[in-house]
From Swiss-Prot:
Organism: Bacillus subtilis (strain 168)
Protein name as annotated: Sensor histidine kinase ComP
Ranges per topology, Cytoplasmic: 1-9, 135-144, 258-272, 324-337, 384-769
Chain's role: Sensor in the two-component regulatory system ComP/ComA involved in a major quorum response pathway that regulates the development of genetic competence. Plays a role in sporulation, at least partly interchangeable with that of SpoIIJ. Probably activates ComA by phosphorylation.
Catalysed reactions, as listed in the record: ATP + protein L-histidine = ADP + protein N-phospho-L-histidine
Keywords: ATP-binding, Cell membrane, Competence, Kinase, Membrane, Nucleotide-binding, Phosphoprotein, Sporulation, Transferase, Transmembrane, Transmembrane helix, Two-component regulatory system
GO biological process: establishment of competence for transformation; sporulation resulting in formation of a cellular spore
Length: 769
């Protein structure tokens, strides 16, 4: 089905290009189709045949008229194309013995204003549609959307309906059928596109839309058998307009009802965009041409002029089909309602004044003038806001310019680094905008003591406002007005509140709603900025204290140890995946070679065999050492089975190599720890054992790890040589106690060491859970 519609779409594109080329040639040459000319016995040009709906009939020509002059010249073959009149500005004809001068041929000459709506705009619309079609085909190479082909057909349908609606080729019978079918079927194609488009995003719309094609086919049949049925041409025109209006209103209602049903669905914004484009496109044509013709027989604006906004439909659909990001339709609708309300009042005043003073243009009735001035006013208000936003034009003086002042204030807050700077910028902003001359900052303590913060300035007598200071501290942004100004809470810290007192030399008027809203916004911005500045100041003080103490904070130690463990793990993986695997492979090759070598008869066999055996043993030692190194760098058992199993393996490995006895007791350890804490405890015990091997000369080592209530206790004890803590500070550092202490601090624990020369070494570590 998709391949069939694809081929059909391509065929329609080719046929449309041929049709547009044909109509363009007719328009460029001003050929009046439907008005057949031939020479009579006297070699006079006579109108032999004229179609009912042709442009020749529209300008007043009748069958049997004899043409005396064309463009004030004697008729000749140069004024004919295919037997039809062409390039006509005026005609002098003879009818029933009377000479008649006809000159109303504006619609067939491209140098007239009417040609813009009859030929230029429709042709421009067609070429834009072709560009959009190629863009849709390009995008659809990846999407492979069925809706894309229906959208292409819709673009071509509206383009052909628009360009075939008028001009010198109106009398062409085939052109009339093409215009009728494409004109009435455009709302149906529109609904089919919406159905397919929503279906491809998983939404249902309408079923059996194809049955609606019965309406244009029925109208086409009546048009075809018009003479046989003896149907009046005015009735046919009304029937066609009623059919189009019915289908258009049906499509609009279907989309609206679907939106009302799924107003909170994720695709509701798509439906709103469809309703917007539908209304803007069809409403002018329906209101100013179709409905007036149906009910009164006269139109307000000509069909081609009122239908010019139909171009919004395909472009809106193309944008919706290819765009990755949509405009905010709620915002657009809100702005349109706002601009429409603003434009309505001056429009009614202007038109009312024109009617009252009787200065109305003859060609512009009150309805036309109302529409014209409304559109102009609407466009003026829209472009005014666009220009204001784009160039940030100052619509007011700096006083009372609340929005710009907030924007400027937030920009200034980005560069403040102290509380005094925050207060300074706040005071300057308020003094620039409001009718106050002075601003002061105060701190109100929890016991309602008022402290003046601007020490470098002469402060006011704030004792008059003691009660107001007590009442204003209830919430941030609260404002209390006094005779010559107001008080406002702008922030808090702990139990203290920061209050701004703004005064004037004279009694100030009451604050307006806009001013109160603006001040509250400023106070909230100030409160956030104060919190940030205070946090930064506290952090700087804390860093200074740490620098003086010469120790790193716990969070930094944890980070450093985490980075160290990550580096250890990476190195262990590299050793295991590269060096260790190469060694194992080399050892395997050596074993195979040694096995083959024993089978051969070689006088030097024993000597070479001994060397190979020695090399094999050395490789075994290297492999074993590499494995142990990988395990020490990254204790895989700890990651897989936990701390207790990893410690048991660590003690077992150490026991094979050390000259002393190691006892490990973890039976009462049941705490659940995160991986970082387990790694730190593992490294601490590993460091204790390493120190015992290097320095203790012990014969017995005891390690106990227990958990009691919300506490973890690690006890280490050996009977080695010990050391004097007071005299041997450097020695203790060399024993690795520095790393142990840092890890204990990272765990937020406490380390207690008992040792002296010749009396062994004891260490207790307590960690709160």
């Amino acid at each position: 089905m998709k391949n069939l519609i694809k081929k059909f779409t391509i065929a329609v594109i080719v046929l449309s290009i041929l049709y547009i080329s044909y109509t363009t040639y007719i328009s460029m040459n001003g050929i009046i189709i439907g008005t057949k000319i031939h020479k009579n016995d006297k070699s006079q040009f006579m109108i032999e045949e004229i179609s009912e709906s042709s442009y020749g009939q529209f300008v007043g020509l009748r069958q049997g008229d004899i043409i005396l002059k064309i463009n004030k010249e004697k008729p000749s073959d140069k004024h004919l194309k295919w037997g039809y009149l062409s390039h006509i500005n005026s005609l002098d004809i003879l009818r029933s013995g009377k000479k008649i001068h006809l000159k109303d041929f504006d619609l067939v000459t491209l140098n007239r204003p009417y040609s813009f709506f009859l030929f230029v705009l429709p042709l421009f619309f067609y070429f834009l549609s072709i560009i959009c079609i190629f863009y849709i085909l390009k995008v659809n190479k990846k999407r492979r959307s069925f809706a894309a082909y229906i959208l292409i057909l819709l673009l071509l349908d509206i383009s052909i309906a628009y360009i075939s609606a008028g001009g010198p080729f109106r009398g062409h019978i085939i052109n009339r059928y093409i215009n009728l079918f494409t004109f009435i079927s455009s709302p149906i194609l529109y609904l089919q596109f919406i159905q397919r488009y929503l279906g491809e995003i998983g939404k249902t719309f309408l079923n059996r839309i194809s049955f609606l094609y019965i309406i244009p086919i029925f109208n086409l049949g009546i048009e075809f058998f018009q003479d046989y049925l003896q149907v009046d041409i005015d009735f046919l025109a009304t029937l066609n307009l009623v059919s189009f209006a019915t289908l258009t209103l049906f499509s609009f209602s279907a989309i609206y009802l679907h939106l009302n049903k799924y107003k909170y669905a994720e695709h509701s914004f798509i439906l709103k965009l469809l309703i917007l484009t539908n209304t803007l496109s069809f409403a002018p044509f329906l209101i100013f041409f179709v409905l007036p013709i149906i009910f009164t027989g006269n139109y307000i604006f000509p069909a081609l002029a009122s239908a010019s906004l139909l171009v919004l439909i395909p472009f809106g659909l193309v944008y919706q089909f290819v765009a990755n990001k949509m405009f905010d339709i709620e915002f657009i609708l809100g702005r349109m309602r706002y601009y429409a309300l603003l434009a309505m009042i001056p429009t009614l005043l202007i038109v009312g004044a024109l009617v009252l003073f009787d200065v109305m243009d003859i060609q512009m009735n009150p309805v036309r003038q109302t529409v014209f001035f409304f559109v102009v006013m609407f466009a003026v208000f829209y472009f005014k806001e666009v220009m204001d936003f784009k160039f940030r034009l100052k619509r007011f003086s700096e006083k009372f310019n609340y929005q710009d002042s907030i924007f400027k204030y937030t920009q200034l807050m980005r560069g403040v680094t102290s509380l005094q700077q925050v207060f300074k910028e706040l005071k300057n902003t308020i003094l620039d905008v409001l009718l106050v001359s002075k601003a002061y900052t105060f701190e109100v303590t929890p016991d309602h003591k008022v402290i003046f913060l601007d020490k470098h300035e002469v402060g006011p007598d704030w004792n008059f406002y003691q009660e107001e200071f007590e009442n204003v501290t209830s919430e941030i942004g609260k404002i209390i007005e006094v005779n010559q100004g107001f008080l406002m809470k702008v922030g808090e810290r702990g139990g203290s509140s920061y209050v701004l007192l703004c005064l004037s030399n004279i009694n100030t008027p009451r604050l307006t709603r806009d001013e109160i809203s603006w001040l509250k916004t400023l106070s909230f911005y100030t409160s956030v900025s104060m919190e940030n500045v205070l946090h930064i100041e506290e952090l700087m003080e804390h860093l200074k204290d740490l620098k003086q103490e010469g120790t790193n904070p716990i969070w930094l130690k944890k980070l450093m140890f985490a980075i160290e463990e990550k580096q250890r793990s990476g190195l262990a993986r590299d050793l295991h995946d590269s060096v260790l695997q190469d060694l194992i492979s080399l050892k395997r090759q050596c074993e195979l070679f040694l096995g083959d070598f024993k089978k051969d008869d070689n006088p030097c066999r024993e000597e070479v065999q001994d060397k190979l055996v020695q090399m094999n043993e050395q490789m075994s030692d290297v492999i074993s050492m590499t494995r142990e190194t990988c395990h020490e760098l990254r204790p895989q058992l700890l990651y897989d089975l936990g701390l207790v199993k990893a410690l048991s393996k660590l003690v077992a490995q150490q026991q094979e190599r050390v000259p002393f006895h190691i006892r490990l007791n973890t039976g009462r350890f049941t705490a659940s720890l995160d991986l970082d804490s387990q790694l730190n405890l593992y490294r601490i015990i590993q460091e204790f054992l390493s120190n015992a091997v290097k320095h203790s000369q012990a014969t017995d080592v005891l390690i106990m790890l227990i958990s009691i209530q919300n506490k973890i206790v690690l006890h280490y004890e050996d009977d080695g040589v010990g050391f004097d803590q007071e005299k041997n500070t450097e020695h203790s550092m060399s024993m690795g106690l520095s790393g142990i202490k840092e890890r204990v601090r990272a765990l937020d624990g406490r380390l207690r060491i008992e040792t002296s020369e010749g009396k062994g070494f004891k260490a207790d570590i307590e960690i709160e859970l």
